[in-house]
């Protein structure tokens, strides 16, 4: 479960960073794109996060929903349909 908590914390930091940056640039929306692979590196190209993850894929879905719900509770509009593609579309 520690790995899951680390994933959620990392995803949450990434979301916060991109959203704050988009707001500063007066963007109307931002796409959080998460890619899970066998690396433990951050790939900044195309704002895609790649982190090591080799356990139950269901935990990824749980983490995505947690992040989306967290953003929605902050008053942001979230596209839940994109979660299946490991993306979260957020309207600012």
Task: Name each model feature, range by range.
Residues 2-23:
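Short terminal alpha-helical segments
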Residues 25-82:
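Acidic, low-complexity, intrinsically disordered interaction modules
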Residues 86-92:
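A generic structural motif
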Residues 8-9, 50, 91:
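N-terminal non-cleavable signal-anchor helices
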